[in-house]
Structures are given as structure tokens and as C-alpha cells.
């Protein structure tokens, strides 16, 4: 399970380094094989261990290619999916179109989301957090029944 945020860097060869605390689990669970794709709701990337990604692929495969909305989702998510394999030092190459989608430069945030990671430009992540907290505090975000039942 992946949680928390880690400030990492994109090196001159367009690689990120997965923090040490996650590497052992990733090598044990998926031999460091991962898949990265675009997030369709935010300017960030989604990075999945291969077994988690395979579950997503099955769900996408079950969508109808004859339904325009479902086909578009398949095209965007699958069309941007890129296999990534961690090297022994925990580095992953992020390809150009993916870097462009998330406007990645040197300073990057790796955000644990339990079964996957989000990869953000550092200032975009900070802005997202500030806006999100502000919307919650101001009541702009209506809490659903499920959220009201959540006790933190």
C-alpha cells in the first residue's frame, strides 16, 4: 500500500527514482514492472504496479468500442499507457507525451494512493492541495453520504 507524498526529481535522462520505502514491495509484487498513463481528471500521471494495471485493463476491455464515450476513455487511457520497469536503483523512465501531459520538470511529487501513485509537477500538486482544502473548508464541496459516514 502506498501512502504519503515524496518530493522527487526528474533527472536529465527523464527518469524518476521511486523512494526506497516502496522499492522492496514493488520488486516483490511485480518485479518492478509498472504502467504509467494520464489522469483524465487532473494534470498528473497515474503509475500502477503491473498487477493493478491488469485489473484496470480488464475493466477497460469490457467497455464497448461502439459507445463513443467508452471508446474515447479507452483511447485516452490505453493509448497513453506506457510500460515502465524499475532498474535496480529504482529509476523509471517517463516518456515525452506523459511528461508533457503533467508538465513535469525537475521537481516532482510522487503521491501514494494506496494501490497506485500519482505523479505531479510540484507546484501543481501544492495548488491542488490548497484548492481542495479551501473548497472543503468553505463548504463548496458537498459531502456525500459515504463521506459523512467516514470517521477520521
Swiss-Prot record:
Mind listing the UniProt keywords for this protein, alphabetically?
A: Cytoplasm, DNA-binding, Repeat, Transcription, Transcription regulation
Q: Which GO terms describe its biological process?
A: negative regulation of DNA-templated transcription initiation
What superkingdom does the record give?
Bacteria
One Pfam family it belongs to: MraZ
The principal localisation class reads cytoplasm
Q: Per its record, what are the GO molecular function terms?
A: DNA-binding transcription factor activity; transcription cis-regulatory region binding
Q: Is Cytoplasm given among the entry's keywords?
A: yes
Q: Tell me the CDD domains matching this sequence.
A: MraZ_C (cd16321), MraZ_N (cd16320)
Q: Which InterPro entries match?
A: MraZ (IPR003444), MraZ_C (IPR035644), MraZ_dom (IPR020603), MraZ_N (IPR035642), MraZ_sf (IPR038619), SpoVT-AbrB_dom (IPR007159), SpoVT-AbrB_sf (IPR037914)
Q: Which GO terms describe its cellular component?
A: cytoplasm; nucleoid
Describe the location of the SpoVT-AbrB domain by residue ranges: 5-52, 81-124
Where found in the cell? Cytoplasm, Nucleoid
Per the similarity annotation, which family is this? Belongs to the MraZ family.
Query: Assembly and partners?
Result: Forms oligomers.
> What PANTHER family has UniProt attached to this entry?
TRANSCRIPTIONAL REGULATOR MRAZ
Write down what this protein is called: Transcriptional regulator MraZ
Can you name the source organism? Answer: Colwellia psychrerythraea (strain 34H / ATCC BAA-681) (Vibrio psychroerythus)
This chain is encoded by the gene named: mraZ
Amino acid at each position: 500500500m502506498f501512502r504519503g507524498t515524496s518530493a522527487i526529481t526528474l533527472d536529465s535522462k527523464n527518469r524518476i527514482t521511486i523512494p526506497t520505502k516502496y522499492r522492496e514491495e514493488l520488486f516483490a509484487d511485480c518485479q518492478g514492472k509498472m504502467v504509467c498513463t494520464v489522469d483524465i481528471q487532473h494534470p498528473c500521471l497515474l503509475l500502477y504496479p503491473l498487477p493493478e494495471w491488469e485489473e484496470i485493463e480488464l475493466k477497460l476491455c469490457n467497455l464497448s468500442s461502439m459507445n463513443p464515450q467508452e471508446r474515447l476513455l479507452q483511447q485516452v487511457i490505453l493509448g497513453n499507457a506506457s510500460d515502465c520497469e524499475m532498474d535496480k536503483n529504482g529509476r523509471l523512465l517517463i516518456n515525452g507525451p506523459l511528461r508533457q501531459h503533467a508538465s513535469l520538470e525537475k521537481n516532482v511529487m510522487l503521491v501514494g494512493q494506496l494501490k497506485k501513485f500519482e505523479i505531479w509537477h510540484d507546484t501543481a500538486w501544492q495548488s491542488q492541495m490548497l484548492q481542495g482544502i479551501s473548497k472543503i473548508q468553505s463548504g463548496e464541496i458537498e459531502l456525500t453520504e459515504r463521506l459523512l459516514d467516514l470517521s477520521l
